[in-house]
C-alpha cells in the first residue's frame, strides 16, 4: 500500500513544495460551494490562522466523503421501516421480515449517498473546528501534539459514512464536570482511555454475528440509541468520545484473516504524545490500551483509516484501472507495527499494462491486498509485506482476478519460497497427522488438489460403528509440501493448507 500524503498538511505547512494544481482545486471547491466559502471567510475575518489552516485541511480532503443511507424498501421503493436493532436475535428478525414480505412483496435494499460537499453547512464545520481547538487547549493529552497529528486524530468532523451531527457537543454533554475532571487528572493517556472505555461498556455491547451484514454506519446518537452492534460500531463510538474529549485516537484493522473465511476485524488506538507511540486496544473490552494482543496470525495487511485523501495522481482514483477493493482507498499501511514484515522486489516475466496485485487466499479465491504499477515495469515492488504467509501475484481483467504467478510463501527470513520448488515431497497418510482441524473435520469434508480441484479424499464419520477417518478416493497420493483445498460445504469452510515433513500443518 503506497504511503498516503496528508493533502493540506503539506499545503499549509510546506506550501512551497506543494503542487499549484492542488491549490487551484481547493480554491475552486471553495468557490463552487458557498457553505465552504463561508467557513473560510469566517476565519479570515477573525484573523485566526491556525483555524483557517484547519478549515483548509478539512475542505481539501472532503473529496467524495459523505453519508450513505441504507433502507429496505418494497417494489414501489417505499421503506418498510427495517431496523436491525429492533430484534433480539436472527429468529425474531426473520419472522418480522417474512411477515412484511407476505404483505409488501419482495424487498430490496436501497442505498442513497449524500455528499458532504453539498450537505455540510458552515455552522456545522465551524462548530467542529472550534470544539476541536478548545479541547486541544484543555486536554493534557494533546500536549506536544503536532498539527499533522491533530488534523488526523482530533479534528475530523466524521469517522465514517454516518449522518452528520454535532457529536462533539453530545459527547461533552454526556459527561459530568466531575467525570471530565477525572479524565484530565490521569497521568497517562492509557489510564484516561480505560476510564472512558469502561463508561461506554455500560452503554453499548457487541450484538452478535448478525450485525456483520449491516452496512449502515451509525452516528454517535444512533449508536447510543441502538445499544449494540459489531466491532466497527464499537470502535466508532470510542473514537467519537476520545476525540471529543481531546485524546488523539484512530482506527486500525485487517480486511482478511489468515486461514479464515470470517470477516475482518477493527480496533482502536490512542496516541501517547509523550512517547509518540500508538497503543492499540479492542474497543469496549476488558483489555484496555497497553494490553492488546492481536489474535490473528500474520494477517497480510493492517490498515489505518485516514481522513486525508490520497494523492490526486494515484491510480487508485481511476476506477477503470484499479481493482474495486482498492479504489479510492486512502488507508495507511501500518502492518509493520503489528507483524514482522519485509519488502519484496519480484522480477516479472513480461510487462503488464495494468497493475500487478499481491493477493492472499480468502473464501475460495485470491483477494488483492496491495498493488505495484509502472507502465514500464519489469519488477513488481511491494513494501511492508507480512512474513510467514501465502501469496500469489494476480492481475485484474474484465472484472475477474487471474493468477499471474504460482503461489509462494514468504518465510520468517523474508525469502520467497515457491510451492513447486519446496523439497522432499513425501507420500503420507492423512489419518496419521495429529492436526486438530483435520482430525475433527466433519463428515463429507473433502480434500482437493489445488490446481485441478480434483477430489483426493473425503472424511467418513459413522457414529454407529465409530468410524472417523479420511478415505482415499483417488489414485493420487497426498504429499508433503504441496497445497491442497480443504472444503467443508455445510459449514461454509474453504481453506487451503500445506502438509509439512515434520507432521505439522500450515493453514492459509
Regions inferred by a protein language model and the residue ranges of each:
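Secondary-structure boundary elements
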Residues: 34-38, 46-226
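Hydrophobic/aromatic-rich core segments of domains that either
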Residues: 26-30, 42-47, 182-199, 211-221, ...
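Structured interaction patches on ligand/partner-binding surfaces of diverse proteins
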Residues: 397-423, 490-508
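Short Pro-Gly-centered beta-turn/loop motif in secreted/extracellular proteins
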Residues: 378-399, 469-490
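Beta-strand-rich domain onsets/edges
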Residues: 316-342
Amino acid at each position: 500500500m503506497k504511503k498516503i500524503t496528508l493533502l493540506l498538511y503539506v499545503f499549509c505547512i510546506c506550501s512551497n513544495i506543494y503542487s499549484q494544481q492542488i491549490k487551484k482545486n481547493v480554491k475552486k471547491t471553495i468557490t463552487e460551494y458557498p457553505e465552504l466559502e463561508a467557513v473560510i471567510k469566517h476565519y479570515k475575518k477573525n484573523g485566526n490562522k491556525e483555524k483557517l489552516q484547519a478549515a483548509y485541511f478539512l475542505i481539501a480532503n472532503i473529496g467524495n466523503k459523505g453519508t450513505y443511507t441504507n433502507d429496505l424498501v418494497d417494489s414501489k421503493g417505499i421503506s418498510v421501516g427495517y431496523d436491525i436493532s429492533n430484534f433480539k436475535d436472527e429468529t425474531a428478525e426473520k419472522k418480522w421480515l417474512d411477515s412484511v414480505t407476505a404483505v409488501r412483496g419482495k424487498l430490496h435494499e436501497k442505498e442513497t449517498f449524500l455528499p458532504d460537499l453539498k450537505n455540510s453547512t458552515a455552522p456545522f464545520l465551524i462548530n467542529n473546528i472550534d470544539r476541536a481547538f478548545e479541547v486541544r487547549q484543555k486536554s493534557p493529552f494533546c500536549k506536544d501534539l503536532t498539527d499533522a497529528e491533530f488534523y488526523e486524530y482530533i479534528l475530523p468532523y466524521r469517522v465514517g459514512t454516518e449522518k452528520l451531527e454535532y457529536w462533539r457537543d453530545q459527547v461533552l454533554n454526556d459527561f459530568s464536570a466531575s467525570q471530565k475532571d477525572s479524565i484530565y487528572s490521569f497521568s497517562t493517556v492509557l489510564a484516561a482511555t480505560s476510564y472512558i472505555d469502561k463508561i461506554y461498556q455500560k452503554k453499548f455491547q457487541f450484538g452478535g454475528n448478525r450485525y456483520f451484514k449491516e452496512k449502515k454506519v451509525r452516528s454517535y446518537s444512533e449508536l447510543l440509541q441502538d445499544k449494540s452492534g459489531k466491532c466497527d460500531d464499537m470502535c466508532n463510538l470510542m473514537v467519537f468520545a476520545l476525540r471529543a474529549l481531546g485524546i488523539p485516537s484512530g482506527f486500525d484493522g485487517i480486511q482478511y484473516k489468515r486461514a479464515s473465511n470470517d470477516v475482518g476485524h477493527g480496533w482502536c488506538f490512542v496516541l501517547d504524545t509523550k512517547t509518540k507511540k500508538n497503543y492499540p486496544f479492542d474497543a469496549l473490552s476488558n483489555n484496555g490500551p497497553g494490553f492488546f494482543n492481536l489474535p490473528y496470525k500474520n494477517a497480510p495487511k493492517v490498515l489505518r483509516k485516514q481522513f486525508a485523501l490520497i494523492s490526486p495522481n494515484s491510480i487508485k482514483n481511476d476506477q477503470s484501472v484499479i481493482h474495486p477493493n482498492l479504489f479510492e482507498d486512502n488507508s495507511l499501511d501500518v502492518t509493520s507495527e503489528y507483524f514482522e514484515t519485509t519488502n519484496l522486489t519480484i522480477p516479472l516475466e513480461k510487462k503488464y499494462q495494468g497493475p500487478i496485485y499481491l493477493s492472499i487466499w480468502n473464501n475460495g479465491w485470491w483477494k488483492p491486498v496491495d498493488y505495484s504499477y509502472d507502465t514500464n515495469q519489469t519488477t513488481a515492488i511491494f513494501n511492508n509485506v507480512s512474513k510467514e504467509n501465502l501469496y500469489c501475484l494476480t492481475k485484474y481483467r474484465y472484472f475477474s482476478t487471474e493468477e499471474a504467478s504460482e503461489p509462494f510463501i514468504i518465510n520468517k527470513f523474508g525469502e520467497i519460497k515457491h510451492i513447486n520448488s519446496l523439497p522432499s515431497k513425501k507420500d503420507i497418510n492423512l489419518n496419521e497427522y495429529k492436526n486438530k482441524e483435520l482430525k475433527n473435520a466433519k463428515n463429507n469434508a473433502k480434500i482437493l488438489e489445488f490446481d485441478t480441484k480434483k477430489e483426493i479424499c473425503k472424511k467418513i464419520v459413522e457414529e454407529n460403528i465409530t468410524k472417523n477417518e479420511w478415505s482415499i478416493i483417488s489414485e493420487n497420493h497426498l504429499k508433503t509440501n504441496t497445497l491442497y483445498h480443504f472444503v467443508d460445504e455445510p459449514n461454509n469452510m474453504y481453506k487451503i493448507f500445506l502438509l509439512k515433513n515434520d507432521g505439522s500443518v500450515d493453514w492459509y
